[in-house]
């Protein structure tokens, strides 16, 4: 299972959730992006240190901001059998409005992942 799939499984309560590509509709949605990470240690450990980004788009500022907080509470500090620790690296970043006047945010995370 990939890191993005593992993260997706933690966000089952989030509607309109996409992985790798945020479609132009619906207006209110969330997308998980794989953003690379850090090289595996040469010490022989099996742990990887991938990074990922969550982007949120919403037509309502207050609703979207609340969703960002909900997602961050679901992820930050969370541990599973494969994701040994998820850490928010950026807080909640306000990206402004897109060309259709929908508000956007991003949150960047780092984790330790065991295959």
Task: Enumerate the language-model features and the residues they cover.
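Short, charged interaction patches at domain edges and termini
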Residues: 1-9, 24-25, 37-49, 85-115
């Amino acid at each position: 299972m990939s890191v993005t799939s593992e993260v997706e499984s933690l966000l089952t309560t989030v509607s309109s959730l996409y992985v790798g590509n945020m479609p132009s509709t619906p207006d209110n949605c969330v997308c998980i992006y794989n953003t690379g990470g850090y090289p595996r240690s040469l010490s022989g450990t099996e742990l990887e240190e991938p990074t990922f980004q969550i982007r949120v788009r919403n037509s309502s500022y207050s609703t979207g901001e609340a969703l960002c907080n909900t997602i961050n509470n679901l992820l930050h500090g969370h541990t599973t059998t494969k994701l040994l620790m998820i850490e928010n690296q950026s807080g909640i970043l306000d990206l402004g409005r897109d060309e259709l006047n929908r508000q956007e945010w991003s949150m960047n995370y780092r984790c330790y992942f065991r295959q």
